[in-house]
Amino acid sequence: MRFTSMIFVLVVILINSLFNFNVLASSVIETTKNDVCSTPCTRRYGTYECWHDCLHERYNDGGCVDGRCCCKK
């Protein structure tokens, strides 16, 4: 029973990694000439945190776009 459970867990991990390879490969996304998107937005890292980090990095504005924090020059 434990062996079967372990195999099931490993198969789930393998399948999950196959579906997420595109997300991991693109760490920086440019939405326009003035936008730089890098950090993923989550429940704990939302629009306010993104905006704050963009201002700290000397961008004029920032917000979550398509699940990523995008900073505007």
UniProtKB/Swiss-Prot annotation:
The keyword Secreted applies. InterPro entries: Defensin-like_dom. One of its GO terms (cellular component) is extracellular region. The lineage of its organism: Eukaryota, Viridiplantae, Streptophyta, Embryophyta, Tracheophyta. It comes from Arabidopsis thaliana. Residues 1-25 form the signal peptide. Disulfide bonds join 37-71, 41-64, 50-69, 54-70. Keywords: Antimicrobial, Disulfide bond, Fungicide, Plant defense, Secreted, Signal. The keyword Cytoplasm does not apply. GO terms for biological process: defense response to fungus; killing of cells of another organism. This is Putative defensin-like protein 57. Pfam families: Defensin. It is found in: Secreted. Belongs to the DEFL family. Its main location: secreted.
